[in-house]
Curated annotation (Swiss-Prot):
Annotated residues for binding of Mg(2+) 1: D248, E260
EC number(s) recorded for this UniProt protein: 6.3.2.-
SUPFAM superfamilies recorded: Glutathione synthetase ATP-binding domain-like (SSF56059)
GO-annotated cellular components: cytoplasm
Positions annotated to bind Mn(2+) 1: D248, E260
Protein name from the UniProt record: Probable alpha-L-glutamate ligase
Organism from which the protein derives: Psychromonas ingrahamii (strain DSM 17664 / CCUG 51855 / 37)
């Protein structure tokens, strides 16, 4: 198959692993810088151009779109979709998962466990907002934050009010969430491919750090999931419409709580922690689905 990977940096671990694994399985793998693509949106003949040339119609697309380029990246992915390329994660699903508020509203509607969460725009709602999620301590998150950036733990109601007022003062959109103390600064990353959890790791925050992101000095070990944790991860991926994603869970006294569904999960941490060939599993999914009827190809439904 001819497969295109959208990535800003071909030297990143995940991009390199996908290219190596794809070529080892006999596929043609092209890595294209998302922001250097441009589109010809012509009636009946949509194309993507790159470095002065028209790109071919690929069999499949693996989008590695960073949060900072979500708008343009999903536009490029959507252009490939209307050309008839099978996208492992449809552009609309990526957009859905990147909007933290929208994704939580969708998960909430389907009864997925989540930390109690509040959202507001006016300062006069702050006291009740904090009270409504259970009171301090609370976690305050920027809607646009990634890798633990823009996430603050407020230990007291007064501190929480000050932080929320400061964010509102700069017109930032924020979520206010209950703090799951029993999680102990750890979360679980479930890697879901094709409706199955294929690997899972427990990420522990560095000493004195409540955020468990590996980018912030956290560590990771393989973990065994409970049945309900596995089902929660699979259902969250399905609700987002993602075939390949990372679902982050917290273990709480009332069951697993979904923190985020990541449409472009990194492979280095989970391959290292579990010893599993995740990149190979991505291609197994593509090969199986590309053998199905052409009606399965994504066409960009909005």
């Amino acid at each position: 198959m001819k497969i295109v990977i959208l990535s800003r940096n071909k030297s990143l671990y995940s991009t390199r692993r996908l290219k190596e694994e794809g070529e080892a399985r006999g596929h043609q793998i092209d890595i294209i810088d998302t922001l250097h693509c441009y589109m010809d949106i012509t009636s009946s003949r949509p194309t993507v151009r790159y470095q002065g040339e028209e790109l071919p119609v690929y069999d499949a697309l693996i989008p590695r779109i960073g949060a900072s380029v979500t708008f343009y990246g999903t536009a490029v992915a959507r252009q490939f979709e209307v050309m008839g390329t099978f996208n492992i994660n449809e552009s609309v699903a990526i957009s859905r998962s990147r909007d933290k508020l929208r994704s939580m509203q969708l998960l909430s509607r389907k009864g997925i466990g989540m930390p109690r969460t509040g959202f507001a725009s006016k300062p006069d709602n702050i006291k009740d907002l904090i009270k409504n999620v259970g009171g301090a301590p609370v976690v305050i998150k920027l809607l646009e934050g990634t890798q633990g950036i823009g996430v603050v733990l407020a230990e007291t109601a007064k501190t929480a009010e000050s932080i929320i007022e400061a964010f509102m003062g700069i017109k930032a959109n924020i979520l206010v969430q209950e703090f799951i103390k029993e999680a102990g600064g750890a979360d679980i990353r479930c890697l879901v491919i094709g409706g199955k959890v294929v690997a899972a790791m427990k990420r522990q925050g560095a000493e004195g750090e409540f955020r468990s992101n590996l980018h912030r000095g956290g560590s990771a070990v393989v973990v065994k999931l409970t049945k309900i944790e596995r089902e929660t991860a699979v259902n969250a991926a399905k609700i987002m419409g993602l075939n390949f994603c990372g679902v982050d869970l917290l273990r709480s006294e009332s069951g697993p709580k979904v923190m985020e569904v990541n449409s472009s999960p990194g492979l280095e941490g989970i391959e290292t922690a579990t010893g599993k060939n995740i990149a190979g599993m991505v291609f197994e999914f593509l090969e199986k689905n590309m053998k199905a009827e052409h009606s399965n190809k994504t066409r960009g439904r909005g």
